[in-house]
Amino acid sequence: MANLVFLRHGESIWNKMNIFTGWVDVPLSKGGVKEAKIAGKLLKSYKFDVAYSSELIRALNTLILVMQENKASNFIKINHDSVKMKEWGKVYGAESINYTPVYKSWELNERYYGKLQGLNKERAKEIYGKDDVFLWRRSYETAPPNGESLKDTYERTVPYLKRYILPTLTYGKDVIVTAHGNSLRSIIAYLEKLNSEEVLKLEIPTGVPLVYNLDEKGLKRLGYLNKKGFDNELI
């Protein structure tokens, strides 16, 4: 048996300001820090063997705050891709084997919003028209100017899920993934076999853990974790 936890980052400063964020590296708001700490307390008894995150600071910071509250897991250590960083990142000593590795990847980044990034959503409607902005936000295949559609996001997140995250889970490792609304939406669409209409209705709340469990029968959704237990409703 193994647990797989998905966590959208806590509220960012631009979430609070209703601004298209995408790949802009915006930090958490004070409310987002609080959300991440609450998530950490809810997950305090989960012993995570491996962590995955996007490369954006709001997701990484959420992971760090969660793991600070976690009582069962080891300290985290980012595993780097480059040869030099791997060498410089080596930790020597008896405690080095006890770190929980963190793998960060751009494939888990938020949907790239192109020319919408940095625009207040109401201002974007004034510039491009509310119908086009609605279409870009709520269609599966239509992308904003110079940006990604949700389908484009799916086509980079799901291969990463298959190549790295799911194999780790099948080895019996407990995994946490901190990412973003649209990158997680596309991953969950794959796991839940949602069609293009269903995935557009899927809303991923900030800072609320979504827990899956893998056993001999396969991967099963337990639901969103809260103080009372699990809420299994997805859409």
From Swiss-Prot:
Record keywords, A-Z: Gluconeogenesis, Glycolysis, Isomerase
Coiled-coil regions listed:
none
Specify the superkingdom: Archaea
User: Which E.C. number(s) belong to this protein?
Assistant: 5.4.2.11
Family per similarity comment: Belongs to the phosphoglycerate mutase family. BPG-dependent PGAM subfamily.
List, alphabetically, the PANTHER family matched.
Answer: PHOSPHOGLYCERATE MUTASE (PTHR11931)
Q: What is this protein called?
A: 2,3-bisphosphoglycerate-dependent phosphoglycerate mutase
